Amino acid sequence: MSYVEEHGEANLIGAGPAMLADVVAGRRFREIAEPTADGSWTIRDEVLFPAVSDCFPHRLLLANSDRMRALSQPVPMPTWPDVHRLIVQLTTTGVEVDRSVGAVARLLAAMDREGLLEPVSEPAADLDHAHMTFLGHSTVVVRSATAAVIVDPWVRPACGHYPADYQPLQLRDLGRIDAVVLTHSHPDHFDTGTLLQLPCDTRIVVPKLERETFLSVRMYERLHELGFDDVTELEWWDSVQVKDIEVTALPFHGEQPTDGSQLHPDIRNAGNTYFVRTPRCSAAFLADSGRDAAGDVRQVAARARRDLGSPDYLFVGYRGWLMYPVQLLTSSVGRYLPFVPPESWGVRQRIMTTADEAVDIAEIWKAPHLVPYADGGAPWYWQIGLGPRLDEAASENPVFDPFPERVSVAAATRTKTGSGVHRSTVNVLLMRPGDSIVSGGPQPRIERMQNFAWPYGEATAAVADAAYLG
């Protein structure tokens, strides 16, 4: 980061290969990797496969809604299920707190002493009628008449820095949740602080992973440590039933160290994408997927259309993350860098799907409605550096954190002929955090909650210059 501050990111990219060569030649890198005869290296097994017994949840971090008071409390490993039950009780209205467990009583006393116990608000609205509710970033609730499944739950606390009538939705606002579906173990998709607010017997579906690695948390094991007792590992193309909702796991390609070959190709950011079908609609959730040496999300879309049919709604991450390997140093996935082979150091990588590719996928899958997501979308995200700003200070990095309107522009400018610019038949739905789809059919209706209205304008004007993306 100091190099970027002094010389600028453009110079970092140009100097990247030489800088990375110096790093690889250094003593500290040799502590994690062995050089090979071809000028590459092999990462040591103890790095590739961390000892799970040495890495366990040992501390609970708590803060009040405005982050002015905080508590860091040690939690002995055997007491996590008791602490989990306490958190559920504290975040649920009308539930009496059980103070009979010693560890729980001590934690409550510490929270009270630090002023961290606040009244729990009543649910914001009755959302049981909604087919789907978008909470922001990658979090979506899918409902049938009898069940509800939440994808990648990540809720943020209320805060005085946000508009008074536009605060983050909480789990208690969503009604009954029958199951959780997790795509991968990056912290903006696998948020234990949110998950601990759900009862211990909540069903959770996670990707199949035999062994925890440097790039992937084995969520099955970690969730059991926290007290969850109904966790299912689901392999690609397998399905589970949650009452009348069917959840099918699909391959997760992309968001790997490179979009081509990598060192230790078996060590991946392991994940699932999902096709979720209810009696009244269907949706697919592609999270941060894209393409890599093992496959391409567009191939997944083609097979899924044959095997499962077309989803009514396709939720696609569109961030692109077009970057050179040295830029990983300034990203949230710097740990990818040891897996990038030297011949790729000077080659730009496409880590995720771009806006234009999102429309490609929808056309291949024959999905009538495309929802851009997985890029923040509200102040509680962009204030921590996730996603573009969509308020009056609207700003974006088009190749890293673009406006969601970029997907609308991509759909409206698919090709150009002598008669003009031609659009896709795919309908792009721009959903804001708190929006719900409340009716099906060819023109679904988006409903915004009362007292939870989007307080900002639209960013379409900011991308009007992109009349044709090509």
Regions found by a protein language model. Give the residues of each.
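Active-site-proximal loop/helix segments of hydrolase catalytic cores
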Residues: 193-194, 256-365
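Metallo-beta-lactamase
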Residues: 104-127, 209-281, 414-434, 438-448
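Short internal beta-strands
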Residues: 201-213, 315, 368-372
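Structural motif
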Residues: 147-149, 178-179, 203, 245, ...
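Pre-active-site segment of Zn-dependent metallo-hydrolases
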Residues: 2-81, 110-127, 141-185, 192-197, ...
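Binuclear metal-ion centers of metallo-dependent hydrolases, dominated by the metallo-beta-lactamase
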Residues: 1-35, 224-243, 329-470
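Active-site environment of divalent metal-dependent phosphoester hydrolases
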Residues: 158, 186-190, 211-214, 235-241, ...
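Active-site-proximal beta-strand elements of phosphoester/diester hydrolases
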Residues: 131-134, 148-152, 246-253, 282-289
